[in-house]
Every structure is written in C-alpha cells, then in structure tokens.
C-alpha cells in the first residue's frame, strides 16, 4: 500500500513541477516572439529552451506549424527560415522509469535529421515521428528529385538511436 502511495505522490510532484515549468516557458516565449529573428544555422546553440516550447499545445492535439516565408539576409539574398519545429534540440531529462520513444530531430549543422529517444514524460511535441517527415519539412537546400534522393539516402540509414 505504501508503494502505491509513494507512486501517486511522485506522479503528483512531477505534474506540479511540469506545469510550473510550462507556465514559465510560455511566459518567456510569449515575450520573445514579438521581435524574433531567425537563428543562424551556424549558431545552433543560440536556440533556448523557451524557444523550443513556443510551439507547445495542450490536450494532446497535434498542430502543424505554419510554413514561414523567406526573410532577406544581409547580402540581399533570400534565405528560407526554418519552422520552429525544425529548431528543436533534444535535451537531457530526468524522467525516471519513463518509457522512451524513437523520434527524429533536424540538425542544421549536418543538414539532416538524426534519431534520438524521447521520454514520454516530456510534454513537448516538436520532435518528428519519422525521418521522412522531418527531412521534408526542414531541408531547404535541395528541391525536386535531388531532395527525394537525399531523403531516401539519409532515412535509409539505420543509425544507433542516442538517448535524449
């Protein structure tokens, strides 16, 4: 009986702490969105945890992020911006006893999607369910047949999934 009580208490504490983190992140993300500029691909560490939670929703509904229009760079050339979902970075968590799901994230340094394991206790939904979906949404430097060939090449590999 005590084990059940401890398990319920642990679940309650995790949900309270998770809700507090969500409220803090949503408040910070709301203030950052007004003057947000695209993150340069050469600086992936500039993405913060607040930016990663901006696309979060409640109730388990999956919403597709809107495709953002290209914004001119300093040289006058148009450089396409990545959707927020493509800026997601897998983070280390401490979800003790949690199940882990295989998911994909876009790595702008390699310009490809990479697998990782995703703890079920996280409420974020920015990670991609499949490599193909990830590559189709985030890869901007190739078009048409070249893009399809690259997606098949990257997604056909079966790399080791790293823990996130």
Swiss-Prot record:
Keywords assigned by UniProt, alphabetized: Blood coagulation cascade inhibiting toxin, Disulfide bond, Hemostasis impairing toxin, Protease inhibitor, Secreted, Serine protease inhibitor, Signal, Toxin
Domain BPTI/Kunitz inhibitor: 86-138
One of the record's GO cellular component terms: extracellular region
InterPro entries from the UniProt entry: Kunitz_BPTI, Kunitz_BPTI_sf, TFPI/VKTCI-like
Gene knockout outcome: The tick attachment time is prolonged and the engorgement body weight is decreased after gene silencing by RNA interference. No significant difference is observed in the feeding period and survival.
Tissue-specific expression: Expressed in salivary glands.
GO biological process: envenomation resulting in negative regulation of voltage-gated potassium channel activity in another organism
Disulfide bond positions: 86-138, 95-121, 113-134, 131-155
Practical and industrial applications: May be studied for future application as a vaccine, since it impairs tick attachment time and engorgement body weight.
Induction / repression: By blood feeding.
Localization annotation: Secreted
GO molecular function list: serine-type endopeptidase inhibitor activity; toxin activity
A Pfam family that the UniProt record links to this protein: Kunitz_BPTI
Region (Disordered): 20-84
Leader sequence segment: 1-18
Biased composition (Low complexity): 27-36
Keyword Metal-binding appears in the UniProt entry: no
General function of this protein: Anticoagulant protein that may inhibit serine proteases. The anticoagulant effect of this recombinant protein on blood clotting is found both in the recalcification time (RT) and the activated partial thromboplastin time (APTT) tests, indicating it acts in the common pathway of blood coagulation.
PANTHER family: KUNITZ-TYPE PROTEASE INHIBITOR-RELATED (PTHR10083)
Name the record gives this protein: Anticoagulant protein rhipilin-1
Organism: Rhipicephalus haemaphysaloides
Lineage: Eukaryota, Metazoa, Ecdysozoa, Arthropoda, Chelicerata
